[in-house]
């Protein structure tokens, strides 16, 4: 649909008392000709090498160390909240920002960590009621801690472990479920470490 139709959809949801969350992807972008790859013939938004510049999906990774890229992403998110009146954003693939390419063995991406903190802090200053949600499957601490406490500044984090365990439990035959009760209770071991949001992720339920 058109931008105006999307605005109308969000407005209709609000009239019905339903909030709308924007799925926001600040990690990578498509390589299609109409996109940002080699925008002016040079790698402005992406890395200039394949090792860090190409994601596992074949898309281009944003280079978050560049101030202009940080501003571009911040202004894009602000635009969706301000002009379309979304109630918050769900940030995609946060683990790929916390760690280089999402690989913990490669270490923490300090530049991206700084970006996340500034990004969330900036949005909260302009939109205090906006809900900021992280899609993150790592054990990196402080994802939902305020930035002033050293955290990343998200309001909630998807509990992907709970989702996986629950789906696996119900995929197990009834005669075997008594041995797998721990899959229903394990999330309580870590549940108080962050402010978790329970969800069934679109990426997973599509597989049945």
Per-region residue spans from a language model:
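Conserved alpha/beta catalytic core and glycan-binding cleft of carbohydrate-active enzymes
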Residues: 85-87, 99-208
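Substrate-binding/active-site clefts of carbohydrate-active enzymes
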Residues: 1-86, 90-108
């Amino acid at each position: 649909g058109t931008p105006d139709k999307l605005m109308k959809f969000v407005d209709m949801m609000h009239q019905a008392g339903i909030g709308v969350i924007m799925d926001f992807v600040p990690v990578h972008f498509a390589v299609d000709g109409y996109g940002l790859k080699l925008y002016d013939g040079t790698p402005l938004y992406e890395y200039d090498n394949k090792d860090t510049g190409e994601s596992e999906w074949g898309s281009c990774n944003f280079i978050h160390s560049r101030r202009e890229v940080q501003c571009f992403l911040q202004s894009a998110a602000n635009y969706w909240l301000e002009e379309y009146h979304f109630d918050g954003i769900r940030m995609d693939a946060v683990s790929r920002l916390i760690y280089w390419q999402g690989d913990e063995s490669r270490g923490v991406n300090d530049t991206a960590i700084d970006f996340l903190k500034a990004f969330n802090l900036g949005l909260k200053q302009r939109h205090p009621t906006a809900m900021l949600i992280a899609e993150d499957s790592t054990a990196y601490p402080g994802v939902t801690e305020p930035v002033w406490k050293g955290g990343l500044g998200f309001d909630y984090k998807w509990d992907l472990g709970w989702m996986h365990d629950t789906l696996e439990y119900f995929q197990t035959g009834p005669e075997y479920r008594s041995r797998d009760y721990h899959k229903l209770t394990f999330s309580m071991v870590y549940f108080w470490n962050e402010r978790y949001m329970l969800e069934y992720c679109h990426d997973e339920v599509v597989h049945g």
